[in-house]
A protein has these predicted regions:
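Glycine-enriched alpha-helix->loop->beta-strand junction motifs that scaffold or abut catalytic
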Residues: 114, 132-138, 156-164, 181-182
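Short amphipathic alpha-helices and their capping/turn segments at secondary-structure boundaries
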Residues: 24-39, 65-76, 177-182
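Single conserved hydrophobic/aromatic residue that forms the stacking wall/gate
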Residues: 1-3, 183-193
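A short acidic, amphipathic alpha-helical/loop segment
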Residues: 25-30, 128-132, 151-155, 175-179
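Alpha-helix termination/capping residues and helix-transition junctions
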Residues: 38-41, 110-112, 157-158
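Glycine-rich phosphate/ribose-binding loops and adjacent secondary-structure elements
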Residues: 141-176, 185
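N-terminal basic/disordered segments at the start of proteins
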Residues: 4-42
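Active-site beta->alpha loop and helix N-cap motifs at the rims of alpha/beta catalytic domains
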Residues: 16-23, 45-132, 137-147
Length: 194
């Protein structure tokens, strides 16, 4: 039997929620049934992405058209959080009625073991999702390009966000980023779902 050796875990957030479904349907069973093949200090916290043609998307070009129910079932099987990438910064109120995006949020908010989330750029969309899909958690998108450290710190202190993804230009500001670690939360898989 495999025994974990390390006490600290690095949680990875993987891309291609819909786009790489075929890969994950092979990789995840291997990862969890043969942990001895992988470092014991790493685990998967979430897989993120959006299907093609989602108006709320926009931060990344996606090409996956997998059935959202199958995608969600695969991640649920392994206790991994799914994150919809809805980082369109140009949304207007008329876009909030989009049937495809609302159906995805309704499906992903039906959590049984692990809470799912949305990576988000637009404050308009954030307010809408908070009121319509309160079971989802929110991640502030790197597409906001918060390069001023004070702006980044304000975002970290915003209670609406479970996570804030810094702009890559702040990645090496270790002395200042360590201060922000005081505000971080555990992996969504470690949060209880009520």
């Amino acid at each position: 039997m495999y025994k974990r050796q390390s006490t600290k875990t690095a949680y990875y957030h993987l891309p291609g929620l819909f786009e790489f479904y075929d890969l994950y349907s092979v990789f995840l069973p291997l990862f969890y049934s043969h942990r001895e093949y992988f470092y014991d200090w790493c685990d998967i916290a979430s897989v993120y992405g959006a299907p093609a043609d989602c108006i709320w998307g926009g931060g990344r070009v996606e090409s996956g058209n997998r059935d959202p129910r199958k995608v969600l079932a695969l991640l649920r099987e392994y206790g991994i959080s799914a994150r919809l990438t809805f980082s369109n910064s140009q949304l207007e109120p008329v876009h909030l009625a989009d049937k495809k995006c609302n159906a995805l949020c309704a499906l992903f908010s039906e959590n049984d073991r692990v809470q799912n989330g949305v990576i988000i750029h637009s404050d308009l969309l954030l307010d809408y999702l908070k009121s319509h899909y309160p079971n989802l958690y929110f991640v502030s998108s790197t597409t906001k390009v918060l390069t001023d450290f004070a702006d980044f710190l304000n975002e970290v202190k915003n209670d609406d966000f479970l996570y804030v993804v810094p702009d890559f230009r702040l990645n090496k500001a270790f002395d200042r980023l360590n201060t922000c670690l005081l505000y971080t939360s555990p992996s969504p898989r470690d949060r209880s779902v009520s």
